[in-house]
């Protein structure tokens, strides 16, 4: 799994046209024809619990992304967690993520 690292990478994805939001997270996506890889970035605010809670949220998001990574289009993606995500059951989060991928037509 390749991650977005620099502020420049994050800013270019934030300015992209494709995004989907629900009550759990905001998904940003930018197609990247030049790269033959998929890159992901996770953003979890300090408004979401303590460090243990934020790491739990990141682990869940990372696992959901890893499960669907093989079927995604090449590009850069950011998952921005919203307040309250730490209280959501894993299955509901997974279903919301899959629905967002379908709505944005990101499944190859």
Roles of regions detected by a PLM:
Residues 1-108:
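Positively charged, solvent-exposed patches that mediate nucleic-acid binding
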């Amino acid at each position: 799994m390749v991650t977005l690292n620099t502020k420049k990478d994050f800013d270019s994805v934030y300015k992209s046209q494709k995004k989907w939001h629900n009550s759990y997270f905001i998904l940003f996506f930018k197609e990247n024809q030049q790269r033959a890889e998929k890159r992901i970035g996770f953003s979890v605010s300090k408004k979401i619990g303590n460090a243990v809670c934020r790491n739990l949220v990141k682990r869940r998001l990372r696992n959901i992304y890893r499960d669907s990574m093989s079927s995604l289009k090449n590009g850069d993606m950011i998952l921005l967690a919203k307040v309250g995500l730490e209280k959501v059951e894993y299955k509901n989060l997974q279903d919301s993520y899959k629905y967002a991928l379908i709505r944005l037509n990101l499944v190859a």
